[in-house]
């Protein structure tokens, strides 16, 4: 008898939660119009560049040019330590920048405050039909997102900036389940 009441209560709670989420949760019916079946960030970036016939590219956080070297259009890479062709932080780059970009890839300092600033600054220099791609948006475990960094393989809390950006009125955001999560931001 106790089990039956407990099971009945569980079913009622499940039903109430289902109704609540149908009424109050986000309705998401946007389409990104990408037919993307590859696994890596550089595959997605090159696919987007080719599909949209983009001419220029900005990469924030180049770390040994792992992605940067695979991009075959006019490009600027920003990194304070290694890779790219602008030695300095993204903040320093944006202070002196006067160019707009078709495609911007953010894979720099994986901390919410900096990623948020990188998104805001990137939006200022994004061409009308351009796209921003962010890496490391879906950490596989709590240790992968812990700030400060405690492990070599690390996503940081990039995901928080992407979640916040979803509330901004003038952009659309998407997350691709690929390569530790790829966030995509476009102007509406």
For each feature predicted by the language model, list its residue ranges.
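A short alpha-helical cap/connector motif
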Residues: 1-105, 109-188
């Amino acid at each position: 008898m106790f089990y039956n009441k407990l099971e009945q209560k569980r079913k009622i709670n499940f039903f109430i939660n289902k109704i609540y989420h149908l009424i109050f949760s986000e309705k998401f019916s946007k389409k990104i119009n990408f037919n993307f079946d590859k696994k890596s960030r550089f595959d997605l970036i090159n696919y987007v560049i080719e599909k949209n016939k983009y001419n220029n590219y900005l990469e924030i956080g180049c770390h040994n040019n792992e992605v940067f070297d695979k991009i075959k259009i006019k490009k600027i890479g920003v990194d304070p330590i290694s890779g790219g062709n602008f030695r300095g932080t993204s903040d320093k780059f944006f202070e002196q920048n006067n160019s707009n970009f078709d495609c911007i890839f953010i894979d720099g300092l994986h901390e919410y405050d900096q990623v948020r600033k990188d998104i805001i600054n990137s939006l200022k220099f994004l061409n009308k039909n351009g796209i921003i791609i962010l890496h490391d948006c879906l950490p596989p475990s709590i240790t992968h997102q812990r700030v400060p960094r405690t492990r070599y393989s690390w996503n940081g809390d990039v995901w928080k900036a992407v979640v916040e950006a979803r509330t901004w009125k003038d952009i659309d955001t998407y997350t691709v389940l690929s390569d530790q999560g790829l966030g995509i931001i476009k102007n509406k």
